[in-house]
């Protein structure tokens, strides 16, 4: 019993263990199917129905062998262990580096209690245990707890025998493993984007501050006042089958369109009420230029590609924040009254859904939010993004097409018309993220789906005219344009000080905003301080002409 008390006290050092501790303290072991066997060295082996889940004779050696297969150096890592059954794996992993942490996902309270009653460990302060939690709660915790910059540190190890002791456990751990892998891929994609785009975001923010004035998106807060419904249009291939229906709905619905879906609308003489663009300057910029001609409001960020916005009337641009790069400085507080924060979350569709909710419509109607492929296409035929489908179709036999994983990933997903369609790991990951957000919004605003070829979203029903009794023309009026609360001068002064002082000291906060990749390489001693300064000075020289405009 002393072991258990000591172990619980150690686990209490981490606030994220409190739920697990409460479950352990309440649980009483009765008629256990698990048992403990001691070897000659007083090391334990866990048995299930008298069958060992780990080595009876050499659990430490087994642990070393398994961990060393997954870890080739002793740098700090975050280990995710599916089942506590072989605690020696976890303990050995933690012993390799004092800064490593372990997250244990365990379905059975019984086995966890049995182990904590019998083991001794000096590493429990660095353990988080998620005990008999719902799968969606595990994924939500992972999303919240693991920072993007830490995603490279993760190793994930499933205890094969413990996760297959019965059908229920197998289903549980298989689902957790699948969803975690998708979430890790999503965060790796985001990290890669951050490494690549951060210098561009930083430059764009400075350019937009200098040349592209606008208002806060708070100008549009609650503008629909639960009276006018909203149609959110993404660029999935399904919308090509619904052009006439979208034309009809545009008379009574506020049309909010993603930038890469905008071309589909203007090519079919449909004028949206607003366009959302958060892109770094690729195919969507052409569509934004068309939006300028059409006099359509643009919801965007200071980190977005700046050229198409130049010389637009200030009353056409409405900014929100991703809280990325220099946005963390120019906005005094991401939660302040005038600055609206919608996280990037890997895809423009996520902040667009948040904006839809922010406008407070009668209901939200989705179109083209497919998360799957229709006739080997992932995008509308009018979208410039359709080029990705061509590259991915194997009509081009080049190394380049290996970079695109939206097609031919051998994943299937069920759609509203009950047909299984091809998808990909990345699209399924985005769909799950989108579904989680949608189900939070549904508590306040109903969400429907127009396009039956789209992947099914939990609790989002297919739309029909019975859902809608919209007879009045939409009438959207802006009475008060709200200025952004931006610390422009303070930011410029801090940037100038950072550049001038870089020979003496490196402000880690600024350095990480300009180039997290180079800063990471510097911290890991993969590049010298001189090489890092050369990169920063090169970046600064490229934006000097913009800084002179302030």
Predicted segments, located by residue:
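Short, polar loop motifs at secondary-structure junctions
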Residues: 86, 107-109, 259-263, 300-307, ...
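Aromatic- and Gly/Pro-rich donor/ligand-binding loops
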Residues: 174-228, 239-241
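Acidic, Ser/Thr-rich peripheral helices and adjacent loops at domain boundaries
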Residues: 121-129, 276-282, 289-294, 380-402, ...
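Class I S-adenosylmethionine
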Residues: 1-78, 86-92, 198-219
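Polyanion-binding loop/helix "lid" in catalytic or ligand-binding cores
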Residues: 346, 395-454
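SAM cofactor-binding core of SAM-dependent methyltransferases
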Residues: 78-132
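Long, compositionally biased charged/polar accessory segments in the mid-to-C-terminal portions
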Residues: 428-550
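Acidic/Gly/His-enriched mid-domain segments of enzyme catalytic cores or analogous surface patches
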Residues: 112-197, 266-361, 515-550
